[in-house]
Amino acid sequence: MSQIKHCKIEEIPAGHKCEHEGYEYFRRKFVPFGEAKNTHVCVYEIPPLKSAYPYHFHYKTEETFYIISGTGILKTPEGERKVSAGELIFFPAGEAGAHKLTNGSETENLVYIDFDVTHDLDVAVYPDSDKIGIWGMGINKIFPMSADVDYYDGE
């Protein structure tokens, strides 16, 4: 992206994802992956009692959430706590930045902006389900952590 970008949130089309029980979101991609060198910015709207993603951390990506409206339950390595409109939350790369944000309301959507500092390739770990994900450079794969093979397997 070689120019300044400006718009109202409602002008960005919202993509909807609902593929697994307990997980659902509407995402507006303001700065999609690949449009800027190291930045990815999206606005998420999470329906009541749902989460966008499972508990996870990234090895390279840093994330910052700004809660626009609603209330959520934030799970981190320190436990769970409530979050609400006006709060900023930073997740560093690595295990210390593990997180899962769930809409805690039964009636109101949780809306937040996700600002990511990205890299060409990232690895995410899902501690609760013992999985690992690899993204970037044409790769989009998730494996169980137990999927260990010998370095020369298949050579």
Task: Enumerate the predicted regions with their spans.
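Short beta-strand segments
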Residues: 53-55, 81, 124
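Short beta->alpha connector loops
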Residues: 49, 72, 94-97
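Ligand-binding loop in jelly-roll beta-barrel domains
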Residues: 93-121
